[in-house]
From Swiss-Prot:
One of its GO terms (molecular function) is toxin activity. It is found in: Secreted; Nematocyst. GO terms for cellular component: extracellular region; nematocyst. Residues 1-22 form the signal peptide. Transmembrane segments: none annotated. The keyword Signal applies. Disulfide bonds join C389-C402, C396-C410, C412-C422. InterPro entries: MACPF. Its main location: secreted. Residues 23-35 form a propeptide. It comes from Actineria villosa. This is DELTA-thalatoxin-Avl2a. Is lethal to mice, and may cause hemolytic activity.
Length: 498
């Protein structure tokens, strides 16, 4: 065994271990706190099967998938050439039925709930990656302009959990097509702010997906969601009553096995009938024919019969995911292809998810003025590139941006500005809970100076700001594996120079 192989193996093992130990533990508690959880034991007679494992090991382009409101079918892309399930999975029998409810006091808490339950990174808790799922369960009333609140009644019969072994994920042969397409990617992106520069990377994500299913939980489940716009100002109890009535109808609303539903009064039911909310019933797992029959208002016998199917006929009710770039980085550390896996990760997180498309305008001389761009960080290393999203310097860019105003002051931009290249920043609060610094040509009155200076009774852009501001940094995605890769590449170069 060569010294290089020994060193690389040891460093890779150490890096993966350190990542697991040092990566931040995601806070899975959100404001959609589960209340009054009731648990009962069931006997599981079913054995692990292709049906119970579902899409385990398959790749999906998560931002196109509805992870909440329908049965998630095993129609993903092949990622591994050979992945023997009996050898590569750890299956744990669960055997519990849980009844609880989750209150979502904001759109952010709904996003957090989806990210937590699917193990999708908190940094991807936003509209690009999870927007399709949130829109599906709220009937599109959740948007960048509209905040929502809501509640779900959750009936979950857990049969078993099947999770891929880390050793198999890191060592089993990848699909020959995936390997061929990945290794054909460009290592160096010459103009990272242009989407066309990332065409092959985008095609790879579309073909193989951004994430693979790392864990499948099977059983049978029923979720009754109710949502309304936050400005309607319904309280927690109003959502609870509406969910109970929506699930079982007015006559059986108090008989569905939830503590919050048990005390529903006739007066509350009548009041709820006049409250307009979005209702969504989601049935997952169990038998296909049983799922198809569970529509509209359900009686307690229907509910219990379906939940018990978890004992004998479980199918997937929940999936947990892992990014495809994590698998590729682990596979290609210490090789010339590692940079491509880093590129893929930062392109997805920074360019696509954060939303760092190239924005520009023209000044009074028709010269191009850049507003936002995805570019290399100053400290970027070709072996493991680092990118940033940055916005143009705030203030004037051209003399025509500056306008003399009475009382001897200069306005930058404004409603009558024709140049429209006086750039201004604003911080937008996203409904996913995060914030984003944005840059735009200022058309509002009162934006004084900002590079404009008085020259007699005229104003000129005599002191323009030259400093771009970073709004997203790929340095946040750097980890121990990147450091190990750079050590290995440096050693390889030294060995080749001997």
């Amino acid at each position: 065994m060569s010294p290089y192989f020994k060193l690389s193996s040891a460093l890779i093992f150490l890096a993966i271990t350190m990542e697991a130990l040092c990566s931040p533990i995601e806070n899975t508690s959100t404001s959609n706190k589960d209340n009054d959880k009731e648990t009962e034991h069931i006997e599981i007679s079913a054995k692990p099967s292709g049906i119970s494992r579902g899409a385990l090991g398959q790749g999906f382009e998560i931002h196109r998938e509805d992870l909440l409101s329908k049965q998630f079918e095993a129609t993903g892309e092949k990622i591994f050439e050979d992945l023997p399930m009996d050898e590569c999975t750890v299956t744990t029998t669960l055997g519990t039925i849980e009844r609880d409810d989750s209150f979502y006091n904001s759109t952010e808490s709904l996003y957090q709930s989806v990210a937590s339950s699917t193990k999708i990174s908190g940094s991807l808790k936003g509209a690009y990656t999870l927007g399709v799922s949130v829109a599906a369960v709220t009937n599109n009333i959740a948007s960048s302009e509209e905040e929502v609140q809501g509640l779900s009644l959750n009936l979950k019969a857990y049969s078993m959990s099947s999770i891929l072994k880390k050793n198999c994920v890191n060592t089993k042969p990848l699909s020959k097509d995936l390997v061929s397409d990945f290794e054909a990617l460009d290592s160096e992106i010459t103009k990272p702010w242009k989407l066309s520069s990332w065409k092959k990377y985008k095609v790879l994500l579309e073909k193989y997906g951004s994430h693979i299913v790392k864990e499948s939980i099977s059983g049978s489940s029923i979720y009754q969601y109710v949502f309304a716009k936050s400005n309607q100002k319904f309280n927690h109890r109003s959502f609870t009553v509406k969910a109970c009535v929506s699930l079982a109808g007015p006559k059986n609303a108090s008989k569905v096995g939830f503590a919050g539903c048990t005390g529903v009064s006739q007066q509350e039911i009548e009041q709820s009938s006049s409250q307009s909310m979005i209702k969504k019933l989601v049935v997952r797992g169990g038998k296909t024919e049983t799922r198809a029959s569970l529509i509209g208002e359900l009686d307690p016998d229907q509910i219990n019969k379906f939940l018990i199917e978890a004992e004998t006929d479980p199918s997937p009710i929940q999936y947990k995911f892992e990014p495809i770039w994590t698998i590729l980085k682990n596979r290609y550390v210490g090789t010339e292809h590692f940079a491509k896996a880093v590129n893929l990760e930062q392109f997805y997180k920074g360019f696509l998810h954060f939303g760092c498309s190239f924005l520009h305008t023209s000044n009074a001389d028709n010269a191009d003025v850049e507003i936002q761009k995805f570019d290399f960080a100053k400290t970027s290393d070709p072996d493991a590139p680092t990118y940033v999203c940055k916005v143009g310097p705030e203030g004037c860019q051209h003399h025509e941006d500056c306008h003399y105003r009475a009382a001897f002051w200069c306005e930058c931009g404004g409603p009558y500005d024709l140049a429209r290249t006086c750039l201004r920043y604003k911080t937008e609060k996203l409904n996913s809970g995060s914030t984003k610094r944005e840059c735009y040509p200022n058309k509002e009155s009162g934006f004084a100076w900002h590079g404009c200076q008085l020259h007699g009774l005229s104003c000129w852009c005599s002191a323009p700001n030259k400093n771009w501001e970073e709004t997203w940094s790929g340095e946040d995605t750097n980890n121990a594996l990147n450091d190990v890769h750079q050590v290995l590449m440096e050693k390889k170069r030294r060995d080749q120079a001997k």
